[in-house]
Amino acid sequence: MHSIIFKAAVALLGVSTAAGFSYQNSRLCLKLLAQGVEVDLPNSTDYETEQQNYWSTACTALRPDCIIAPKNARDMSRAVAAIQESKTTRFAIKSGGHSPNQLFSSIHDGVLISTRNLKQITYNEHTQTAVLGPGLKWEEAVGGLKDKGQTVVGGRLGGIGVGGLILGGGLSFLSGQYGWATNNVVNFEVVLANGTIVNANATSNPDLYAVMKGGSGNFGIVTAFTVKTHTQDPEIWGGSMFFDGNHTESLTRAIRDFAEYNTDDKASIIGTVNRNPSLIWVVFLTYDGPSPPEDVFRNFTQIPNIRNTVKRQSYHSLMLANDEYIRHGNRFSIGAETSVNPSGTHGYDIFKSFIDHWNDVTDDFIDIPGSASSLALQPLPRSISTKAKESGGDVAGFDPRYDYLLLQIAVSWNSSTSDSVIEAATRKYYTVQGDMIKQFTNEGKLPKAYCPLYLNDLNANQDFWGRVAPSTREKALAVRRAVDPTLFFQNRVTGGFRLG
């Protein structure tokens, strides 16, 4: 062990000198290595492998002074204690690395805590729960429970990380039946700012438990989630259908009507319109059963398509297939807004204005080499918000009296030289989109309703907590003051939607 630490010290000192890395952070890394915590040093194979495991290459480009990879809650506690002692070290926490926002799960001139070794899957048949590690991808979590005939409420693309998705709410193909992913958590194992390991659930630390459901990483670092499991049919019906842009009116009407009229909680859709540079629609259709009733998706299936991958398959297979749509090797920017689902009277005109605005924004950058743009139109039927409330609620707290529409732009491009243009366009998208929704509301075309934002879809510069109900935000602040009175996570974690 001593020889390993000596070699590591030499390596770190060399890197610190060559790259300007912090000497203090290097000492912190060596201290944890001496305590038996796994630490990756710059230029090592494990370090470089971890760095490649991001969705956006803009995050890959950030270089931490070292990567700490705890294997259990005790290791995580040691890491937190060491960072506390350093006084100034800043850090980021990584689950799946899917957020394209720089500094959320990536860092430069600081240390990265990777949860890659926290990949436990422990099923309890008696309680119908499973313990999941935050380092899992959803395809691993679902695949690990497949032979038990069980599944969990989680990501719709298999390559997304468990930790980040749950802490941000987590929309799922199963949400119509069971609410958000975070509503299905029965216990969080958490390392607090003082290094204490606690459990947060309905009876132990219940206030902490309540605000961690969709409150992101403001209160501690989760080392294990205990989640409800649900019986899963061997086969479900799902896949995607592709349409050319000539069917935009029919598709937007179908999406709007699905949000209002669908009564089958096993049915779920995602509508996306894409420019690269021509206009193509991709609609994800999922039914949690071997075959949907004929009328559930009729408004979509009757539109002529140019490609159709929908079939009977396992839920796990569907998640793996959906990974096809995770574009790799590019930089990414995202931004989002929330609208109440418009009525049939104004629905198409409002949807058209939303798509026209996205098209106008896309015109600002679509000639940049390697650029592409998509707009997701995600219906959020009131059944999801109802199930969420029945399960104890969550921080966002969408109002179950309304059907909502979640809108998200996602932009990809190749070179950092175009960053400022893309980020300006993304900001223009969500700022003007928000103004449009306010205008439609003032004109009486949309009802005046509480419209929180979906945290996992947001740009780093958006104000998640500013759109949360004031009473919920005050409750979250009270918990933060109790568990992190020195603002450790608020001031020392580089990214995320900080509560204050």
From Swiss-Prot:
<dbReference type="Pfam" id="PF01565">
    <property type="entry name" value="FAD_binding_4"/>
</dbReference>
<protein>
    <recommendedName>
        <fullName>Uncharacterized FAD-linked oxidoreductase ARB_02372</fullName>
        <ecNumber>1.-.-.-</ecNumber>
    </recommendedName>
</protein>
<feature type="glycosylation site" description="N-linked (GlcNAc...) asparagine">
    <location>
        <position position="299"/>
    </location>
</feature>
<feature type="domain" description="FAD-binding PCMH-type">
    <location>
        <begin position="60"/>
        <end position="232"/>
    </location>
</feature>
<dbReference type="InterPro" id="IPR050416">
    <property type="entry name" value="FAD-linked_Oxidoreductase"/>
</dbReference>
<dbReference type="GO" id="GO:0016491">
    <property type="term" value="F:oxidoreductase activity"/>
</dbReference>
<feature type="glycosylation site" description="N-linked (GlcNAc...) asparagine">
    <location>
        <position position="194"/>
    </location>
</feature>
<feature type="signal peptide">
    <location>
        <begin position="1"/>
        <end position="20"/>
    </location>
</feature>
<keyword id="KW-0285">Flavoprotein</keyword>
<dbReference type="InterPro" id="IPR036318">
    <property type="entry name" value="FAD-bd_PCMH-like_sf"/>
</dbReference>
<feature type="glycosylation site" description="N-linked (GlcNAc...) asparagine">
    <location>
        <position position="246"/>
    </location>
</feature>
<keyword id="KW-0732">Signal</keyword>
<feature type="glycosylation site" description="N-linked (GlcNAc...) asparagine">
    <location>
        <position position="414"/>
    </location>
</feature>
<keyword id="KW-0964">Secreted</keyword>
<dbReference type="InterPro" id="IPR016166">
    <property type="entry name" value="FAD-bd_PCMH"/>
</dbReference>
<dbReference type="GO" id="GO:0071949">
    <property type="term" value="F:FAD binding"/>
</dbReference>
<feature type="glycosylation site" description="N-linked (GlcNAc...) asparagine">
    <location>
        <position position="43"/>
    </location>
</feature>
<comment type="similarity">
    <text>Belongs to the oxygen-dependent FAD-linked oxidoreductase family.</text>
</comment>
<feature type="modified residue" description="Pros-8alpha-FAD histidine">
    <location>
        <position position="98"/>
    </location>
</feature>
<dbReference type="GO" id="GO:0005576">
    <property type="term" value="C:extracellular region"/>
</dbReference>
<keyword id="KW-0325">Glycoprotein</keyword>
<keyword id="KW-0274">FAD</keyword>
<keyword id="KW-0560">Oxidoreductase</keyword>
<dbReference type="InterPro" id="IPR016169">
    <property type="entry name" value="FAD-bd_PCMH_sub2"/>
</dbReference>
<feature type="glycosylation site" description="N-linked (GlcNAc...) asparagine">
    <location>
        <position position="201"/>
    </location>
</feature>
<dbReference type="InterPro" id="IPR006094">
    <property type="entry name" value="Oxid_FAD_bind_N"/>
</dbReference>
